[in-house]
């Protein structure tokens, strides 16, 4: 009997994998859309915050608003600086959400106990208002901080142009003219004025925000769902949970980090006077008191709460719908 039987080796069928390029592109587009929406709608609040924080006498909101409304073109004045603000927030959000997703997906794939939320073994909660990975508190804190600082550095020149253009200290007639003047008088370094204070503000803010946001989402989702329910949340419930969680998380993180924002504004407006972050803090307290470190807090909380709630709700909704569509098309495995 012959032993020369032919042996056939059958290769396993290729596993379906996530289209990394398409998912990355969609996260970028979703972040861009969410950032543009919030920045355009809330530009007046951002402009008022800049005007209040630039004052040496802790100007209050109502007189500042009255001055703007009494100008020849009040509506145009309230939306002054919308273009740089939209560019900064839109592309900044796109970079931030794309980077944040990449970091979170990478950490989730490690499946280590320190990285994944204890409520789930695979990075996905049973009942959730989100399609994003569920990470531990420290992982949320770290990924939020790293992604925000990275995006902030890339968008820093636009941020400086935005602040200078919104301020009434400078008579810039165009963004191009503002950029040329900054480079001519301060060099390229002038386009990164206040980055230290910005990073010191953004790192803890973004880290705390993601931490608070994920915790609030988890708790609100558990309240909205019946105990041990396997049913997914309704779209309206998910959007409401994300919106409320985004607003509350932004309010908490903003209140904690507002002094950094006040210092950052002064550094970007008058870098020659304030020099660096520590000098700015000393001068602000000496000239205007501790209260100056909390200038514009009410406006910033209002704007941040609304912008974060809008941005994250729009972003999460787009991602949730995309994940569902891709799953139905067989492009990804959930």
UniProtKB/Swiss-Prot annotation:
Q: Which UniProt keywords apply?
A: Membrane, Mitochondrion, Mitochondrion inner membrane, Repeat, Transmembrane, Transmembrane helix, Transport
Q: Which reaction is this enzyme known to catalyze?
A: glycine(in) = glycine(out)
The record's listing under PROSITE patterns reads: SOLCAR (PS50920)
- Membrane topology type: Multi-pass membrane protein
List where in the cell it is found: Mitochondrion inner membrane
- UniProt record, GO biological process: glycine import into mitochondrion; heme biosynthetic process
Q: From the record, give the transmembrane residue ranges.
A: 28-53, 81-107, 141-166, 194-217, 241-267, 296-314
Solcar repeats sit at 22-106, 135-219, 237-321
Q: What are its GO cellular component terms?
A: mitochondrial inner membrane
Q: What does this protein do?
A: Mitochondrial glycine transporter that imports glycine into the mitochondrial matrix. Plays an important role in providing glycine for the first enzymatic step in heme biosynthesis, the condensation of glycine with succinyl-CoA to produce 5-aminolevulinate (ALA) in the mitochondrial matrix.
Q: Which family does it belong to?
A: Belongs to the mitochondrial carrier (TC 2.A.29) family. SLC25A38 subfamily.
Would you tell me the protein name for this molecule?
A: Mitochondrial glycine transporter
Q: Which organism is it from?
A: Aspergillus clavatus (strain ATCC 1007 / CBS 513.65 / DSM 816 / NCTC 3887 / NRRL 1 / QM 1276 / 107)
């Amino acid at each position: 009997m012959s032993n020369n039987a032919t042996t056939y080796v059958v290769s396993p069928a290729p596993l379906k994998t996530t289209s990394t390029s398409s998912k990355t592109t969609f996260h970028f587009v979703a972040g861009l859309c969410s950032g543009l929406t919030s920045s355009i709608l809330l530009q007046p609040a951002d402009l008022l915050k800049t005007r209040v924080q630039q004052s040496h006498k802790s100007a209050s909101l109502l007189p500042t608003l009255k001055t703007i409304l009494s100008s020849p073109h009040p509506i145009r004045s309230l939306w002054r600086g919308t273009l740089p603000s939209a560019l900064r927030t839109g592309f900044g959000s796109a970079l931030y959400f794309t980077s944040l997703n990449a970091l979170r997906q990478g950490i989730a794939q490690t499946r280590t106990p320190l990285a994944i939320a204890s409520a789930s073994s695979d990075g996905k909660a049973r009942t959730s208002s989100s399609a994003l990975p569920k990470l531990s508190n420290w992982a949320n804190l770290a990924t939020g901080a790293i992604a925000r600082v990275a995006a902030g550095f890339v968008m820093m020149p636009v941020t400086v142009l935005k602040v200078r253009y919104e301020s009434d200290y400078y008579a810039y007639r165009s963004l191009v003219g503002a950029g040329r003047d900054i480079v001519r008088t301060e060099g390229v370094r002038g386009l990164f004025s206040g980055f230290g204070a910005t990073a010191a503000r953004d790192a803890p803010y973004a880290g705390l925000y993601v931490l608070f946001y994920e915790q609030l989402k988890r708790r609100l989702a558990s309240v909205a769902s019946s105990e041990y329910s396997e049913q997914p949340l309704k779209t309206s419930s998910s959007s409401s949970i994300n919106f409320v969680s985004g607003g509350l998380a932004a309010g908490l993180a903003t209140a904690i980090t507002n002094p950094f924002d006040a210092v950052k504004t002064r550094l970007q407006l008058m870098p020659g006077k304030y020099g660096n972050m520590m000098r700015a803090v000393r001068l602000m307290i000496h000239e205007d008191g501790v209260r100056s470190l909390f200038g514009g807090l009410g406006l910033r909380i209002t704007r941040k709460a609304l912008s974060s709630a809008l941005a994250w709700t729009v972003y999460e909704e787009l991602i949730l719908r995309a994940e569902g569509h891709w799953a139905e098309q067989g492009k990804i495995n959930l």
